[in-house]
Swiss-Prot record:
This is SWR1-complex protein 4. The gene is SWC4. Component of the SWR1 chromatin-remodeling complex and of the NuA4 histone acetyltransferase complex. Interacts with EAF1A, EAF1B, TAF14 and TAF14B. It is found in: Nucleus. It comes from the Eukaryota. Residues 21-38, 373-383 have a biased composition (Basic and acidic residues). It comes from Arabidopsis thaliana.
């Protein structure tokens, strides 16, 4: 009897009221029918896929305490002298309009032009080519057009070149500074006094610039070929000059040979020379040539990063050595507490860094040569005692009991049998008896 039948007999409801209400309160899940043509296993994998991006609940912005509004307000610009009143939109916070000067008034910059009096002009500024009216008009245009001499030359009533206008303006300023100063030392460091305007140099500069801008493609190609040929000749001369200079490592190697007892007039055994590495016997001419070529190519660039130049010089200096030697140089730098790349790569620091790398490389070459010398000396010592037999000091003399002082009899050499032949031959006890013949009877 099930639970439902017992409830029917007792007259109890099949489902409690609380459970019925709970079922009513729960939302019913939407049932999705499996599409046709898709298996049940595949369709089960499609449900419950995790979202590609995590859902982020955006927090509600708290209500702002400030009340912001945009209003159409009037303003005046301090750069203008006529007190013109204009209008623009302004951001107003809590109904309090902004105060202060116009925000774009700070960009109104003007050039400070020197002013002179009639007395100063008569005493210091008179010129046979320029009149006072022309000079006054020039300074007025310089004030209005902010020293834009191209615009001034276009507006000037008298036909004057840009160079002539510049020369007159700067000469008047220098004369006024010199006349108003109490001593020449007071204005000696002024830019107009230290670097005066040179009209001849300016004309020559513009003439050269116009020639460069007006040349044809054929002339540009020809100039490029000339520059490339000059670069090649410079590199060849520097490489030849570097190759002719004596190497520091070669001089130190020669001094070490003298200290070891090698006389310059005598010849050294070929075995010792063959054992020494090439970097310790002869100077690295190829490395110096690469170093000079790299230096010449960097100079032709005119503008380059100091770290890039240092890397190129280090690669050129390490081109003739192996990777193991380069790692030993870097390890030595780290042991000395020196960075592989300088933190402040000035010219002096880079030169000292390259010099330190050269000295470390020379030290490693000398250590390698010393190691070869020591191995050569040890081999000579071992070879001198190899021909002499060792004295049997610890061996006890035991006479032969069979010889009694005479020579041991030499055993007769037995004939060797092949392997496995003796084992295959049966013993005499196991031999089968020979059959008797008629002649034996």
């Amino acid at each position: 009897m099930g639970g439902t039948d017992a409830k029917d007999i007792l007259g109890l409801p099949k489902t409690p009221l609380s459970l019925t209400q709970e079922k009513k309160s729960r939302p019913q899940k939407e049932s999705h029918r499996k599409p046709d043509g898709i298996s049940r296993e595949v369709y089960a994998l499609t449900g419950g896929v995790a979202p590609l991006m995590p859902s982020i609940d955006l927090k509600r912005r708290p209500p702002a305490d400030e009340k912001v509004a945009w209003k159409w307000l009037s303003f005046t610009n301090s750069a203008r002298k006529d007190d013109l009143q204009l209008y623009h939109w302004v951001r107003v916070v809590n109904d309090v309009p902004p105060t202060g000067d116009y925000s774009f008034a700070k960009y109104n910059k003007s050039v400070d032009i020197l002013k002179y009096t009639d007395e100063e002009y008569e005493n210091h500024l008179t010129d046979s080519v320029w009149t006072k009216e022309e000079t006054d008009q020039l300074f007025e245009f310089c004030q209005n057009f902010d020293l834009r001499f191209v615009v001034i030359a276009d507006r000037f009533p008298v036909s004057r070149t840009v160079e002539e206008l510049k020369d007159r303006y700067y000469s008047v300023n220098r004369a006024l500074l010199r006349a108003r100063a109490q001593s020449p030392a007071d204005v000696a460091n002024h830019p107009l006094m230290k670097e005066p305007y040179d009209i001849t140099r300016d004309r020559e500069r513009k003439r050269a610039l116009s020639m460069v801008l007006s040349q044809s493609r054929h002339q540009e190609k020809k100039d490029a070929e000339i520059l490339a040929e000059a670069k090649r000749i410079t590199e060849m001369r520097l490489a030849a000059r570097r190759a002719e200079e004596p190497d520091v490592s070669a001089n130190e190697n020669a001094g070490l040979d003298k200290a070891d007892g090698v006389v310059p007039g005598r010849s050294v055994s070929p075995t010792s020379n063959s054992q020494l590495p090439a970097t310790a016997v002869a100077p690295s001419t190829l490395t110096m040539a690469d170093y000079a070529s790299t230096l010449a190519s960097l100079r032709m660039l005119h503008v380059y990063l100091r770290t890039y130049g240092l890397e190129q010089m280090v690669q050129a200096a390490s081109s003739a050595v192996g990777l193991r030697t380069i790692k030993r140089v870097e390890q030595t730098l780290q042991d000395l507490g020196v960075n592989l790349k300088p933190k402040v790569p000035t010219k002096t620091v880079c030169d000292e860094h390259l010099e330190l790398r050269k000295e470390i490389l020379t030290l490693l070459n000398l250590q390698k040569q010393l190691q070869y010398k020591e191995s050569e000396g040890s081999s000579h010592r071992e070879g001198s005692y190899a021909a002499m037999p060792d004295t049997p000091k610890d061996r006890v003399f035991a006479p032969d009991p069979f010889s009694f002082g005479a020579e041991r009899p030499i055993k007769k050499e037995q004939k060797r049998k092949g392997p496995g032949r003796q084992a295959d031959t049966p013993s005499p006890a196991h031999k089968r008896p020979r059959k008797l013949k008629a002649s034996d009877l």
